[in-house]
Amino acid sequence: MIDGEEIAEELLSELEKVDASPKLRIILVGENQASKTFVDEKIEAAERIGFRAEVEKFHENIEEQEVIEEVKAGNKASDVHGILVQLPLPEQISEERVFEALKTLKDVDGLTPKNMGKTLRGEPEILPGAVEAVEKILEQELGSLESLEVTVINNSNLIGRPLSMVLSERGATVTLCNRKTEDLEKHTEKADAVVTATGQRGVLRPEMVREGTIVIDAGYSLGKGDIEDKEKMDRKTSFCGVPGGAGPLTVAVTMKNLLNCYRNQ
């Protein structure tokens, strides 16, 4: 099994040596348990390496404008160096409008229009934590990503779309799948690597991939991931699962992004 936690520990150890204490403000809307757990992990990581983190919590039915005003307040706060809006947001809130309000220099997830534009042009400055985590795992396993066939089961702005651009820039051929993709197995069984990040248990099964495929489960549903039969998947593939896989590395990359935001201000 591929150990993403080991790579995360190496990165956090390097960050711990830095003589700086940047502050992260996290905006959490609603009672999604997976989101709350992920926020707790980010706070714990920040405190461990001498960074600072705080959470602004809001109820599920909050108006979009209130969230935008909270983002703008963080933009103006001189003691806040990075802002993270925990996704997903409730359906009444537009992610696009929220990230349009976020100051690019404080965007630790790389989701403002300016940062997304740079990623799409192949000039990323800040990548979403999960995207860089997956890239690092593939890099560790393969070195070069040229000519790699990758199937990504996720087409969100947080993971699937930026990941496809980053891997394409590295010379990989990427197939991006979404909830309406028919015959998913047709796309997964041809791949050298499969990344799944849907938050839906059982979306990817061992019989859907070839022997020796690299499989990265970046899904997060209360620490369980997208794959049910993990033991069989681990025997058949080079498997990076949940817990202990992409999740801890995603958190570590977020801390690295926070430091970069701090240095750029």
Each model region followed by its residue ranges:
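Short, well-structured alpha-helical segments in soluble
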Residues: 66-78
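Anion-binding alpha/beta catalytic cores of soluble intermediary-metabolism enzymes, centered on
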Residues: 84-145, 202
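Rossmann-fold NAD(P)-binding glycine/threonine-rich loop
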Residues: 96-112, 116, 216-265
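Conserved hydrophobic helix-helix packing surfaces used for dimerization/oligomerization
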Residues: 22-24, 150
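Glycine-rich phosphate/diphosphate-binding loop of Rossmann-like nucleotide-binding domains
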Residues: 29, 34-43, 125-210, 214, ...
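Short beta-strand elements in bilobed, periplasmic/extracellular small-molecule ligand-binding domains
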Residues: 46-60, 174-176
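Positively charged, low-complexity intrinsically disordered leader regions
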Residues: 1-20
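Short, high-confidence coil segments that cap the C-terminus of an alpha-helix
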Residues: 78-80, 191
